[in-house]
Amino acid sequence: PCMTVGNIRDPKVAEDILARGDADFIGMGRGLIADPEWVNKVEFGNECDIRKCISCNIGCAGHRIGLNQPIRCTVNPAVNTGEDYMKQKVNKPCNVVVIGGGTAGLEAACTAAEVGCTTFLIEKKAELGGLASVISRIPDKKRLADFPNYMIHRARKLHNLFIFTNTGATAELVKSLNPDIIVNATGSVPTLPPITGLHDLVDKDGTNVATVLKMIERLNEYPKD
């Protein structure tokens, strides 16, 4: 028998390998760290619920092999505990307001909703996903989109998670939601080096000085080659 491995993330790719007779078995390591239920989800036709590995190698190879520390996972914060947290339902009404619809905000909102909290997610932009969705526009980083896409899909399925997009988290709005807990997940901004005058030029119209985020917004303006 022949087994093949190597970041086989898509169930269709795995099935095609087996159907062609290129291998008898598919071996999977990082994919099962990201989602231990990968195989079960494929078997029962729930591929859209798979939390795919993004091949960052930070928590698995980086921690376990490089640093001899316990395995962690960028996309699966429950890698060492499983979904036991879902059994710990809140025993009284609890309103949670999460500000920021990036991957951290989505994870916080989904987790709160899954344990029974009435949860409100507020995102100032039109789309959820935050920096992960932005960075995934870089050609060599496209697979990063799998993570925010999975998180958005997970969030949309929760009946007690209410999502506001194109909405600023004003004090009035947050107060009107009667929060018991407020989570600040507004993300980060690129670090700039201490160069005199840089702040006056960066990301300004008419200059060629840009942060990586502004550069990504202008990808279509650059030559394809």
Please place each PLM-identified region on the residue numbering:
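Local beta-strand N-terminus motif with an aromatic residue
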Residues: 23, 94, 161, 179-180
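Beta1-alpha1 glycine-rich phosphate/pyrophosphate-binding loop at the start
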Residues: 98-162, 166, 191
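NAD(P)H/NAD(P)+-dependent Rossmann-fold oxidoreductase cores
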Residues: 156, 172, 186-187
